[in-house]
Amino acid sequence: MHSYDYWLIIAFFAVVLVPAPFLGRFYYKVMEGQRTWLTPVLGPVERACYRLSGVDEQQEQSWQKYMLALLAFNLAGFLLLFAILLFQDYLPLNPQKLPGQEWTLAFNTAVSFMTNTNWQSYSGEASLSYLSQMAGLTVQNFVSAATGLAVLVALCRGIGRKSTKTLGNFWVDMTRATLYGLLPLCLVLALFLVWQGVPQTFAHYVDAVTMQGVDQVIPLGPAASQIAIKQLGTNGGGFFGVNSAHPFEDPTAWANLFELAAIILIPVALVFTFGHYVKDLRQSRAILGCMLALFLIGGATSLWAEYQPNPTLNNPAVEQAAPLEGKEARFGTTGTVLWSVTTTAASNGSVNGMQDSLNPLSGMVALVNMMVGEVIFGGVGAGMYGMLLNVLIAVFLAGLMIGRTPEYLGKKLQAKEVQLLVVTLLVMPVGVLVLGAIAASLPGPAGAISNPGPHGFSQLLYAYTSASANNGSAFGGFSANTPFHNLMLGLGMLIGRFGYILPVLALAGSLAMKKTAPIGQNSFPTHGPLFVTLLTVTILLVGGLTFLPTLALGPIAEHLSMGF
């Protein structure tokens, strides 16, 4: 590693951790309707939205009504995007006259962007019109991120409130999350990216002749606006097929740094938002400590693995520093590894190199980051409510060990809450192991694997893990654009999204109705090093014990077979 690599890592953490506490407080004030510095500008717009849609911002909802509103909104978004993708050849802003998507691919794409997964079985510049990218995908990037933020806020209210049946108003939370939480940051980042060289235009693709005399089509489009929200909203779906490895998506070192930091900026800020809701920022610091510990363990492992020479090229005539296959030379090994670990620690899925080219241990780190439920920062809202589920599981285990009724911040965890927690523990195994086993056992779907042996199994395992974790990244050698995989991966995305959201809202409703008992000396503290250790071990054990056999068949077997 060179000095540049160390400065990149330091700058990355600085850009994320310095503004995060202030942004977290801002989100708390926004979501609770308190006045902020943006209120004079956006307040009239917010009130106009309520008047036009007939929403009473003072009318709160029970968890059941909140859930129904969320499901109805997401269904409407799916149907609209599905229609746009099917009939894009009849719609405007299609200068390349691209045809509509085949229906299983359109289903997969619509589910992918509605669930904040952004799995892409297509190449954007070769398959989608400007309208589909802008009015279809970009809109869903905003509202899917806002949905996750709204669910987190509902859970925070459930934990922080007492003896109430309401969790807020879904329509109000969605409006505030989009208007205040996402749009201003995206505007700033989009303008910055345009300055750095990312295109934002409706012009036709450019026909050019290369220095070798070969004709080439250079794709353009309204890319900067979509890239801003794909990073900040932990969406990850690229405007271009190779995502942020494309020079039009990630043209400079500065663009690379801020796009990378944008992946986890809001998820880290929302950790502090939770602390404001429960009036105890010590809880936020403990949770963030756990997230950082898991992130640093994975990052260090991945960096070490990627700087090892490839033993299959163990030849004195071959000089090796670090394997560069699948990496952009302008970003280098450290820049690619840092992005790989960050994009899978958050449910982002964007890449600036090829995940399929990672060494086996680095690929395993990416898999484990997703298998633990995308709780190491995770998606906007989704990562934090996933982490809070693990916090409650850790509290329950601590209660069993010391022989007391488990409680968290004065709320007792009883049979109903534990049952809901168990339901969430089954989401990833069902999505990854059940759906993945079906795909692996059938000769047709298994034909999507491009490599024999352990790496081929890793390709399939990665695809179904990514879909179920709502991540969206992929091992590029996996040919996913088949009717079977389009439908099965779409099902995995739905399970991974709503298999968490529905129990989380039910849990929030149950906790909101409980009284808060005073926290005494005999209560198990959830803000110290002991609890951080317990929480970290809980996350690793739940994920590790469930998926260790599949990891042994994939990346671990590949690592050993290569002779590392």
UniProtKB/Swiss-Prot annotation:
Its main location: membrane. The chain crosses the membrane at residues 4-24, 67-87, 135-155, 179-199, 254-274, 286-306, 382-402, 420-440, 487-507, 528-548. The system is composed of three essential subunits: KdpA, KdpB and KdpC. It is a multi-pass membrane protein. It comes from Pseudomonas fluorescens (strain SBW25). Part of the high-affinity ATP-driven potassium transport (or Kdp) system, which catalyzes the hydrolysis of ATP coupled with the electrogenic transport of potassium into the cytoplasm. This subunit binds the periplasmic potassium ions and delivers the ions to the membrane domain of KdpB through an intramembrane tunnel. Keywords: Cell inner membrane, Cell membrane, Ion transport, Membrane, Potassium, Potassium transport, Transmembrane, Transmembrane helix, Transport. This is Potassium-transporting ATPase potassium-binding subunit. One of its GO terms (molecular function) is P-type potassium transmembrane transporter activity. It is found in: Cell inner membrane. Disulfide bonds: none annotated. GO terms for cellular component: plasma membrane. The lineage of its organism: Bacteria, Pseudomonadati, Pseudomonadota, Gammaproteobacteria, Pseudomonadales. Belongs to the KdpA family. It holds the Pfam family KdpA.
